[in-house]
């Protein structure tokens, strides 16, 4: 189907990483693109929403003019997608601009779902960019309390508090000490590492509780911090969980592994109900 894109969402971290060809990107030599030499062409953008303008002859579930969520479409005026890849935006209460964030929000869904949170567990969301803002809200909806956030930007910390964080910390060298103090010395039960910084992962390992879980939502592309895995992971029974979108279920949702389309539908329901702030 041919879709005219009304909005596409910028994923600053991923797009910048590819533009400067950081390790473990599609543009670096030997990266996940499979191109031995890496480099360009590179088509940034993977998240948006638009309207169907033309259908394939055998498509029955959609009509021209339907609003749809567009994933992996790039920053371009039009995209060509298969019917199975699309989710229609039926609820008129949902603005198309808000709906355009569904795909990137699904990454945060995955990062939180993989933690298998239980009501009453303490959680840290490390990083309050676009993914962190969604992860914070999803953790709150999952019953996390106390719920902490960390970011260097004071405006982001202020927003985190407005969105329900119990406390928001500056991730400096005293972060682990302050989180431990805020949890009575126990540490948090679970954490979502959103920054993609190996230093932030080291911090998380210092403030996570014994047998805690850390979901790696941000892309830790550069391993520039040595980690004592015996001290911080093995001996303390810590679970590190890869939460890249490539690990999600493809056709049928399961606990902790929902399909993209099911996460889109959940996102739309939360937006329509006023339970998620964009």
Where are the language model's segments positioned?
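Glycine- and other small-residue-rich loops at beta-strand/loop junctions that grip anionic moieties
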Residues: 41, 78, 124, 128, ...
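Glycine-rich beta-strand-centered segment in the early N-terminal region that forms part
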Residues: 1-10, 20-74
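C-terminal substrate-binding/catalytic core of Rossmann-like NAD(P)-dependent dehydrogenases/reductases
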Residues: 185, 227-278
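Short, compositionally biased
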Residues: 79-92, 143-145
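Mid-domain Rossmann-like dinucleotide-binding core that forms the NAD(H)/NADP(H) cofactor-binding site
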Residues: 93, 97-173, 177
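Short, well-ordered loop/turn sites that connect or cap secondary structure elements
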Residues: 62-63, 117, 208
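Glycine-rich cofactor phosphate-binding loops and adjacent beta1-alpha1 units
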Residues: 158-241
């Amino acid at each position: 189907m041919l879709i005219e894109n009304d909005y596409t969402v910028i994923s600053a971290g991923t797009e910048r990483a590819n533009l400067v060809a950081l390790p473990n990107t599609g543009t670096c030599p030997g990266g996940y693109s499979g191109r031995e030499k890496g480099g360009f062409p590179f088509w940034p953008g993977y998240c948006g929403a638009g309207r169907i303008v033309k259908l394939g002859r055998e498509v029955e579930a959609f009509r021209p003019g339907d609003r749809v969520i567009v994933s992996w479409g790039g920053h371009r005026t039009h995209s060509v997608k298969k019917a199975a890849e699309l989710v229609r935006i039926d609820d008129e209460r949902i603005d198309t601009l808000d709906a355009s964030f569904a795909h990137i929000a699904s990454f945060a869904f995955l990062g939180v779902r993989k933690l298998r949170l239980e009501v009453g567990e303490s959680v840290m969301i490390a990083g309050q960019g676009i993914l962190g803002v969604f992860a914070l809200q999803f953790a709150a909806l999952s019953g996390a309390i106390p719920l902490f956030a960390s970011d260097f930007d004071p405006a982001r910390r202020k927003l985190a508090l407005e969105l329900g964080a119990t406390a928001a910390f500056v991730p400096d060298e005293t972060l682990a000490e302050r989180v431990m103090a805020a949890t009575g010395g126990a540490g948090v039960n679970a954490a979502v590492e959103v920054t993609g910084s190996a230093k932030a992962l080291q911090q998380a390992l210092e403030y996570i509780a014994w047998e805690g879980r850390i979901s790696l939502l941000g892309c830790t592309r550069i391993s520039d911090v040595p980690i004592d895995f015996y001290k911080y992971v093995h001996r303390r029974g810590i679970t590190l969980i890869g939460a890249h979108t490539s690990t999600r279920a493809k056709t049928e949702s399961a606990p902790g592994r929902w399909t993209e389309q099911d996460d889109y539908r959940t996102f739309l329901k939360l937006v329509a109900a006023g339970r998620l702030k964009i």
